[in-house]
From Swiss-Prot:
GO terms for biological process: cobalamin biosynthetic process. Catalyzes the synthesis of alpha-ribazole-5'-phosphate from nicotinate mononucleotide (NAMN) and 5,6-dimethylbenzimidazole (DMB). It catalyses: 5,6-dimethylbenzimidazole + nicotinate beta-D-ribonucleotide = alpha-ribazole 5'-phosphate + nicotinate + H(+). Pathway: Nucleoside biosynthesis; alpha-ribazole biosynthesis; alpha-ribazole from 5,6-dimethylbenzimidazole: step 1/2. The active site is at E317 (proton acceptor). Its EC number is 2.4.2.21. Belongs to the CobT family. Keywords: Cobalamin biosynthesis, Glycosyltransferase, Transferase. The keyword Thylakoid does not apply. This is Nicotinate-nucleotide--dimethylbenzimidazole phosphoribosyltransferase. It comes from the Bacteria. One of its GO terms (molecular function) is nicotinate-nucleotide-dimethylbenzimidazole phosphoribosyltransferase activity.
Length: 350
C-alpha cells in the first residue's frame, strides 16, 4: 500500500501586532536595544503566539535516531553500532543531552526512526522505524519517495500528540553515525554549493577520512543529479530517516503555531529542507547555536539566522538546543515581568 503525499498548511506569522510588541519592549526600563538578541527573540515569540503574555509550556526535546548506509565506508570516527549504543544511553539517562535536559527542564523523548537493529523492551524509545538504516547514498537512493511521506505522517502524529498535552515548544536533536555526510549532501543539493564548502570533520575525523567523505558525497550528488528535482526528492536520494522525520516534525510544529528550536548542523539541514518545502516555516524557527561544523555557518547565513549561542559544540543530540532554553525563557520573562518606565516612575532613557 503506497503512502499518500503529506502536505502542510503553515500560516505566516502575523505582523499586525509587531509595532505594539516592539513598543512594549522599547518602553521597558532599559536603553533601547540594551537586551540585544533577547529583544528580537521576545518579539518573535510574542508575534508567533499573538498573546499579551507569551509563555513556554511543556517544552519537549525530540531526539531522532537513524543509521546511514554510507557509514559502512568509514566516514565517521565511530561505526554504525554506536548509534544503537547511544540510543540506549539516552534511554538510560546517561548522555550529555539527558544531563542538560534535566538541568533546564526539557522533557526528553527519543525516536527510533531506523537504526540498524531495533531496541526491544526499553522504556523511553518511541518506535517510528522507516527501515533498518538507509541505502548507501553513493550507490543508491537513501530511501523511496513514499518513505519520505510515511516519515512526514509519523512526524505529524508525534507533534500532534505533544500539542495535545499543551506543549508549545519543541526542540530538535539527532543521533546517527554518518549523518553529517547526509546533511552535507542535502546542503550542497539545496544551496547549489560545491561539496567542499559543505563538508566538515563531523565529530572529529582525520584528513584521510575527510577526503574519503568528500569523494563519496561527490559521487552521491553525481549519481542522483537528475533525480534531485525538489526537496522531498533530495531527502529520498540523500537524506536519513531521522532527517526526514525532523523535517516533517518541524513542518507539523509550525503548522500548530509552536516554537521550533533548531540544534546544530544536522537539525539545520532538516530546517533547510522544511523552509524549502514551506517558506513560512522560517518564522517559527529559533536557531540555538552555531556549531563547529564548517558548513553550519553557511546554512545559517542562507536562512538569515542569528543563533543564540556559539560554544564550539560538535556533539549533536540536541545539546545546543537544550542549553538555549534558559535564554528563550529569559526573553519571555523580561517581556512579561520587566517594568516599563511609567510603571517604575522613571524618566525614559533613549
Amino acid at each position: 500500500m503506497s503512502q499518500s503525499a503529506v502536505s502542510f498548511q503553515i500560516n505566516p506569522v502575523s505582523k499586525v501586532q509587531e509595532q505594539s510588541i516592539q513598543q512594549k519592549i522599547n518602553l521597558k526600563t532599559k536603553p533601547l536595544g540594551a537586551l540585544g538578541q533577547l529583544e528580537s527573540l521576545a518579539l518573535q515569540i510574542a508575534r508567533i503566539q499573538g498573546a499579551d503574555q507569551p509563555y513556554i509550556a511543556n517544552p519537549t526535546m525530540l531526539v531522532f535516531a537513524g543509521d546511514h548506509g554510507i557509514a559502512a565506508e568509514g566516514v565517521s570516527i565511530a561505526p554504525s553500532e554506536v548509534t544503537r549504543q547511544m540510543v540506549q544511553n539516552f534511554a538510560h539517562g546517561g548522555a550529555a543531552i539527558n544531563v542538560f535536559c534535566r538541568q533546564v527542564g526539557f522533557k526528553l523523548e527519543v525516536i527510533d526512526c531506523g537504526i540498524l537493529t531495533p531496541i526491544e523492551g526499553v522504556k523511553g524509545i518511541i518506535d517510528q522505524r522507516l527501515g533498518a538504516g538507509t541505502g548507501a547514498i553513493h550507490l543508491e537512493p537513501a530511501m523511496a519517495l513514499e518513505t519520505v511521506d510515511k516519515g512526514f505522517a509519523m512526524a505529524r502524529d508525534l507533534i500532534e500528540r505533544h500539542h495535545q498535552t499543551g506543549c508549545n515548544l519543541v526542540a530538535f536533536g539527532e543521533m546517527g553515525i554518518g549523518n553529517t555526510s547526509a546533511a552535507s549532501a542535502i546542503m550542497a543539493a539545496i544551496m547549489q554549493l560545491d561539496v567542499i564548502d559543505c563538508v566538515g570533520r563531523g565529530t572529529g575525523i582525520n584528513q584521510e577520512t575527510l577526503a574519503r567523505k568528500l569523494m563519496l558525497i561527490e559521487l552521491a550528488l553525481l549519481l542522483h543529479q537528475s533525480a534531485l528535482t525538489g526537496p522531498k526528492e533530495v531527502l529520498a536520494c540523500l537524506g536519513g530517516f531521522e532527517i526526514v522525520q525532523m523535517t516533517g516534525a518541524m513542518l507539523a510544529a509550525a503548522e500548530r503555531n509552536m516554537l521550533v528550536v533548531v540544534d546544530g548542523f544536522i537539525a539545520t539541514a532538516a530546517a533547510l529542507v522544511a523552509v524549502t518545502i514551506a517558506p513560512n516555516v522560517r518564522d517559527y524557527l529559533i536557531f540555538a547555536h552555531q556549531s563547529e561544523e564548517q558548513g553550519h555557518l553557511r546554512m545559517l547565513e542562507f536562512l538569515q539566522a542569528k543563533p543564540l549561542l556559539s560554544l564550539g559544540l560538535r556533539l549533536g543530540e540536541g545539546t545546543g538546543a537544550a542549553l538555549a532554553l534558559p535564554l528563550i525563557q529569559a526573553a519571555v520573562n523580561f517581556y512579561n515581568q520587566m517594568a516599563s518606565f511609567s510603571d517604575a516612575g522613571i524618566e525614559a532613557v533613549v
